[in-house]
């Protein structure tokens, strides 16, 4: 995400959703990613950036669960916030998958370090790049007919960015 090679042609759009951006653990890595994305996009191109924000009052839930099934395949997912260090801007997240398919059962657990962003910190980062304007913002339902006005309580945000230079 920080070693994007230039291509022969520039692109009209790109996306980075589902919180992937927060795997960039330093401000320098985040800035490098945005700068490199700007290099491969045409002027006026769209970049969709989606991530989880840290609200001023803290997160509303430290555990999120969901399950999905298709035929004989069942997947149960549990995401648990293990720690948030506001000073260092680090979150420790555990993701557990329980997979059942017929007689087969698997359990997978991963622990990730993620960078935290408040709304102010995210806006500041984008402004400092000088390469993108925020066109509109959405929640994680991605409904283009329902833009949101984020505030300090916003937890999930999708930014529709336009490359300016």
Predicted segment positions?
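C-terminal lobe and adjacent flexible extensions of AdoMet/dcAdoMet transferase-like proteins
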Residues: 113-165
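Adenine-nucleotide cofactor-binding loop residues
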Residues: 2
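A short acidic, Gly/Pro-enriched loop at the edge of an enzyme's catalytic core
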Residues: 5-14
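A short glycine-rich, Lys/Arg-flanked "PGG" loop and its adjoining helix->strand segment in the class I
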Residues: 29-46
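Short aromatic-enriched loop/helix-cap "lid" or pocket-rim segments at secondary-structure transitions
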Residues: 10-11, 59-63, 148-149
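A short His-aromatic
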Residues: 22-24
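SAM-dependent methyltransferase
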Residues: 48-124
